Amino acid sequence: MRHGKAHRKLGRTSAHRTAMFANMSASLIKHEQIVTTLPKAKELRPIVEKLVTLAKRGDLHARRQAISSVRDVEQVGKLFAVLGPRYKERQGGYIRVLKAGFRYGDNAPMAVIEFVDRDVSEKGKDSGPVYVNDAED
């Protein structure tokens, strides 16, 4: 019987899951939209919704709780400075999960997870190192 089993294991150890969701939360806060598999997106939604609720509270204890969950102080800063005030009047439902077809290699169901009233200009901003070709001089 499957009583009391609230979450998916996703084929990972508990430490791996915790780290993965911390990284995915930071990426979602940073870019306000990410593409992942559907089960991961469904598991990520309540985690980020609770973080936004902490940001709406806005006190020091809430900030420390968010830092312990996300482990990225810069993204927690954005969470409390931008996303908390943006959703101040909304009573939950900050995240949307959209089905996005199937992945080519293994036919895994994919999904787009995004904030409801997201800032479109944040997508892809500072998403990693960029190659600069110096040989063209």
From Swiss-Prot:
GO terms for cellular component: cytosolic large ribosomal subunit. InterPro entries: Ribosomal_bL17 (IPR000456), Ribosomal_bL17_CS (IPR047859), Ribosomal_bL17_sf (IPR036373). This is Large ribosomal subunit protein bL17. It comes from the Bacteria. It comes from Caulobacter vibrioides (strain NA1000 / CB15N) (Caulobacter crescentus). The keyword Ribosomal protein applies. The gene is rplQ. Gene3D superfamilies: Ribosomal protein L17. Keywords: Ribonucleoprotein, Ribosomal protein.
